[in-house]
Amino acid sequence: NYGLIDNLTVNENLDIGLAYKKISKKEKEQIKIRYIEQFGLSNSLKRKVHTLSGGEQQRVALIRMMLKDPIVMLADEPTGALDPKTGQMIIQSLFGLVDENKVLILATHDMAIANQCDEIIDLEQYRKVASM
């Protein structure tokens, strides 16, 4: 369920990600709207999470994580329920955060995504297999 609260709306779930940020309400709304538009969820703000598709729920969860502005992000199969085009957009958004001095630890079986990473570690072999 991506850690979302099913009986809340998308908007209410995203507000959780902003709850402890020390910025104005206006700034919070601006940040939230930017991600909502970027991730193609503009028409879903008032929908209850349980009515969303798996891919939509996954995008809401990723937005909520990004709204918390973490230094280290752990993304386990972040594109698993997404179509290829949306998945690539999400990956580019996550990599954009890395460019802002964030750390992204990404677990994936998709080698096309893995090959875009700075380092690849094989968890079965317990070793680094590539460094870009």
Please identify what each model-predicted range represents.
Residues 48-52, 56:
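Conserved ABC ATPase signature
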Residues 73-76:
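Catalytic Walker B motif of ABC-type/P-loop ATPase nucleotide-binding domains
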Residues 8-16:
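Short coil-to-helix segment of the ABC ATPase nucleotide-binding domain corresponding to the Q-loop/switch region
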